[in-house]
Amino acid sequence: MDSDDCYSVIQDLSATTDKALIRKLQQAISLWKNALLTPEQALNIAKDENEAQAARLYRNYVATLTSYQAVDFDDLIRLPVELFRTDEAARDRWQRKLRYLLLDEYQDTNTCQYEMVKLLVTGPGKKPMFTAVGDDDQAIYAWRGASMENLRTLQTDFPDLKLIKLEQNYRSSTRILQAANAVIGNNPKLFEKALWSEHGAGDPVNVLAMEDDEAEADQVAMMLSAHKFERRAKFSDYAILYRGNHQSRSIEKALRRERIPYVMSGGQSFFERAEIKDIVSYLRLIANADDDPAFIRAVTTPRRGGGLPSS
């Protein structure tokens, strides 16, 4: 089940239409699953009645997914972890399939993912053979359960770990690295690093403080247009990088006003497209007739003219 399906289940179980509350409950359940906490454990550590109610809803949520014979995204790692903890034959079979393991963005792993790693690379008479790539200065997913402590505990859990620092930067100029180091200089450090580059000093970094995202987008579009005219460049020589997709709308509007042609890279996920979710709902219903969210989507899409009787 995707995020929207899970949202619908929680909405039905909580009997509320408060979108913010439903998202908060969805986030709480996800964090508990990623921390490998059962509904009972979540209830035991609840700090107040609101958390206790969320934990009880978590229990009903798990029961509902079980009745649908469905899993959510968090279960895709949590359930294999539970399997490997209790079934040595299954764990051994998968260990033999994996001779080497490469883990990227390790600073953004959560408790469940770290447990999966340990279950796959450790065991009686087994020498761990894996590579973990991570940067403590790039940890940005604590809000969804990621823990930078996983980098620290690696050295404790695997004392023979060999540390290799990749300090040469192949992407940026010296000025960009200096600016980045100034921003992250006060961060708590697990590993001291001295980044350097062979690309020379590079152009100065310009920082503009704008009133809002609309003003920022307008300024970017005007600067791009002026720079192209001065340098007699092509529009294809330019790229605009932004932090999140929520910023794309204002940037697109500004580019259109300046009559700047552009191509969007990325965009909506294939499986998030409405027509794809419609087809998948039919397939899910064929596989499991008790999948209520799939039934509701299938029976209402496309519109068939059915509805409440008119007076």
Model-derived segments and their meaning:
Residues L31, A42-K47, Q95, K126-P128, ...:
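Accessory helical subdomains and C-terminal extensions of nucleic-acid helicases
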Residues D137-A142, R171-S172, M264-A287, V299:
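Short alpha-helix plus adjacent loop in nuclease-associated cores
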Residues I22-K33, E51, A55, D74, ...:
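Short, well-structured alpha-helical segments
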Residues K47, Y100, S248-I260, R273, ...:
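Conserved helicase C-terminal RecA-like lobe
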Residues P159-K162, E167-P261, R284-N288:
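Helicase P-loop NTPase motor core
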Residues D4, E149-E167:
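Conserved P-loop NTPase motor "coupling/switch" region that bridges the ATPase
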Residues M1-A28, E40-E49, R56, N60, ...:
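Conserved P-loop NTPase-based nucleic-acid remodeling module centered on helicase motor cores
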Residues K47-T153, Q168-S172:
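Conserved helicase NTPase motor core
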